[in-house]
Swiss-Prot record:
Gene designation: hutH
Catalytic activity: L-histidine = trans-urocanate + NH4(+)
Family statement: Belongs to the PAL/histidase family.
Protein name: Probable histidine ammonia-lyase
One GO cellular component term noted in the UniProt record for this chain: cytoplasm
EC numbers, comma separated: 4.3.1.3
Gene Ontology process terms (BP): L-histidine catabolic process to glutamate and formamide; L-histidine catabolic process to glutamate and formate
Amino acid sequence: MIEIDGRSLRVEDVYAVAVEYDRVSISDDTLKAVEEKHEAFLKLINSGKTVYGVNTGFGSLLNVHIERDQEIELQKNLIRSHSSGVGDYLENRYVRAIMAVRLNSLAAGYSAVSADLLNMMVEMLNRDVIPAVPKYGSVGASGDLAPLAHIGLAMMGEGKAFFEGRLMDSARALEKAGLKPYQFKEKEGVALINGTSFMSGILSIAVMDAHDILENAIRSALLSFEALGGTSKAFTPWILGARPHLGQVAIGNRFREYLTGSDIVKRADSVKVQDAYTLRCIPQVYGSVADVIDYVENVLSVEINSATDNPLFNGEEVVSGGNFHGEPVALAADFLAIALTDLGNMVERRIARLVDTNLSGLPPFLTPDSGLNSGYMIPQYTAAALCNRNKVLAYPSSADTIPTSANQEDHVSMGATGSLKLLEIIDNVRYIIAIEYLLGSQALEFTDKGMSPSTRKIYEKIREKVEKLDHDRPPSFDIETIRKMMDKKEFISALP
């Protein structure tokens, strides 16, 4: 059970709600504090105070006055008009993450929503009523308006939603779950949709996936390192400590420990001076990726516990601000995209080295009868194609901005785009690593098997499901098998 209180949500909690379907709850104290703020806000509105998005129009329509008896209708119209997303529906796990982040942001108490709204979101998550949210439509300021509006639309019993994984009209989904359509109160529509929870929810899942990617990349690199006869001299502690970036030192020490007991490395240490960069600089490159992952997680730890609505209410005054601007998240998503793209680049270069007999000293394309057999010639092409795709996707979305709302919103973050394309990069890098697992294990068939105990664990785990290559067969199926093993964390479990 994940407790929502508006201040202590962790990235791993978001993952637990989204992927592992952990239930959520809100304490009575949190609900009481939220409701008190809501009641205080209503008193302010009833006094005639002008508040953006409550008794005014939105965006460039901010100078249009809304009568008191139209304020509820305004919120409903906002949800309907802003539900303008297009494209395929986002996977339910990402929508669950988005809802968890938005729920926590609203629970902070600055958005002046009622406890009823929070309870509705809790019940939808716990009863598996997940709004159908199109992927595209957010520019990342003023918040993730379009996709979050689709969540509000489903809450009202309009649009589409998934119930227990099946797509249907949201009214039917709510009914099957034993819920009634939600009636938005003053400010609740704008509070729900005006925030960074779309990009933050997606990035929360992405950064957890990035941890797994790095762990797998370390393990797949062990196979290539030993197959190529690498020397561990570059991982000497004082060398790593002479440039003490946290990630570099940590990765270098782990890699050296994993190689302990290898006869292959022991021989290489006695005769080789240094290796090519893709072997020698694993701590520097992988360590930098680890540092980026930590940076992104730190950004998210702040963002998912922040009030990103506009305007905000502290119990006494309402102030319009800019916390909805997704720049911190947008930059973090782009940074992670660049880091993972370069991780894939290094892995692909080792793959290329494995199949090149002039560089590896191994049989051409890792087949015992090359010529008649092409062996693993083409998987390197696949890795190269995926790297090329990632290099296109790695262009920073945050480098662009397109003014919206008649230039009232004249600078935007494009953080949603950055988070979405990061998902494709992650998928591509997983496949690149799967190819290194496949080819690295095959390359070890041509050594004396004097690998370290740690490397042997990975090698044997692969051989449980993928046979060595004696003659040509389609590599695609083996790549997919290894990819599924990665998804199940089998290699991480085999070598903690």
